[in-house]
Amino acid sequence: MDLTDLTSTDTEPASPAPPPGLVAGVDTHQDTHTLAVLTAQGAVIATSSFPADQQGYNDLTAHLDRLGPLMAVGVEGTSSYGAGLTRTLRQAGYDTVEVLRPSRRVRRHHGKPDPIDTIAAARTVLSGDGVSQAKDTTGPAEQLRLLLAARTRLISAATAITNSIHSLLTTAPEPLRERYRRLDTPALITRLARTRPTRTITTPQQAATSALHHMARTHQDLHHRAERLNQQMHHILTTHYPGLLAVYGAGTTVATQLAVTAGGNPGRIHNETAFAHLCATAPIPASSGKTTRHRLNPGGDRRANAALHRIALVRLRHDPTTKNYANRRTQEGKTTKEIIRCLKRAIAREVYRALTQPPPTDTTSTLAAHRKRHHLTQTDVAHALNTYPARISDIENHRRPLPQLTHRYHQYLTTLDTQ
């Protein structure tokens, strides 16, 4: 559709100048962004469209500068098509907020041309209903988002290849099926990657061997690349989000997802209840008659909810305190699903504190240096704490959250300091 201005915006506003307290709304698309500027009373001052590139962002910002002081700019899709514009507006000093898409009622009555969506976005900013502080996409959280997105695609591709290998083996010649029948998936991938298929294909068995070999090698390459991304994410987490890694049950990918959900400015989330709603763990009353029950919010970020779910499962398996809690709640008549829901709500509270409150300075990142000052090896510490050297390595490198052992490790080194 050919976008045209409803009001001329190519020249300076005619006198008298528009009153102060303007708001703006932007409807973002892949190729163009449409802007609308409204007065505090809701009257439309101007609408215009700009290319969705850096020059267009600069032109849009300059256009806003000419119109006068703005209370806020509402942008649809600040984490998708509007990400670049949001960064430019923030750098220019504009209060930029995320605007939810127009309601279906608005679109049913007024249609869906871009100026209508843009004006609706600006009026949403005026009402204050359906807006939130936009995520900061210029810091470590954005770095983690990009790395996590790539890793997720690599793992998905590796899973698809695994399924294809099993499917091909199902119809492969019997000698191949018999050779690999009893191998689990990791051993199967390793064996297939080590095979040496012939250069010339003359039989179905040779063709199957070659196909399986190349898929297995690709599977290994995908996992190696995913592991390199994992190491990069871990380094960013260690530097900027050590509190998340200290959460019991939060590995690198889980901690990364929670950091991405919160964004680079977690302070935009007003409190831990709002964070629980964001992660879809806030209980919603679902009582009926004499039964008092709660259910979870079906909305929110499902990937963050899945991350909290994984933490809950880890704690149910390995954390004595969580096991005791689960046993007590079971005796009270709670089901396993209800117990996990309660756990996820408590974990969301813990994660919010890890995101918004700085961790203590003496964390596991300093334990290795502390140990070396006493000229101790990881094996020496492991023997003293009656554990394995690998567990000490896990603690020092943030590979595995072990809070109880970490506390004992810290106490052991503190005792050595006093001797």
Task: Report the location of each language-model feature.
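Short alpha-helix plus adjacent loop in nuclease-associated cores
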Residues: 90, 96-134, 146, 187-188, ...
